[in-house]
C-alpha cells in the first residue's frame, strides 16, 4: 500500500488539488505497478508563515 505525502504551501484551488491526487496516483501506479485502489495520497497544506527557506519565512519574502 503506497502512501504518498505531499507538503505544499496553501493557495491551490480544489481543482488543482484534485488533479494533483489523480496525477500522483497515476505516476505511482505506472512506476511501481501498485494496484490503484491501494494508493493513498495525503496532501498537507502549510501556511506561508509556517515554512522557511534559508532562515526566511515564505510570508516574509
Curated annotation (Swiss-Prot):
Q: Where does the record place the catalytic residues?
A: 2
User: Under the GO molecular function aspect, what terms does this record hold?
Assistant: isomerase activity
- Alphabetically ordered keywords of this record: Isomerase
Keyword Isomerase set for record: yes
Q: What is its EC number?
A: 5.3.2.-
Cross-referenced Pfam families: Tautomerase
Specify the domain of life of the species encoding this protein: Bacteria
Family affiliation: Belongs to the 4-oxalocrotonate tautomerase family.
- NCBIfam families per the UniProt record, alphabetical: PRK02220.1, taut
Q: How is this protein named in the record?
A: Probable tautomerase SAR1376
What species is this protein from? Staphylococcus aureus (strain MRSA252)
Amino acid at each position: 500500500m503506497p502512501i504518498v505525502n505531499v507538503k505544499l504551501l496553501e493557495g491551490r484551488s480544489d481543482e488543482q488539488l484534485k488533479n494533483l491526487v489523480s496525477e500522483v496516483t497515476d505516476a505511482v501506479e505506472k512506476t511501481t505497478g501498485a494496484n490503484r485502489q491501494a494508493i493513498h495520497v495525503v496532501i498537507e497544506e502549510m501556511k506561508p508563515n509556517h515554512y522557511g527557506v534559508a532562515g526566511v519565512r515564505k510570508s516574509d519574502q
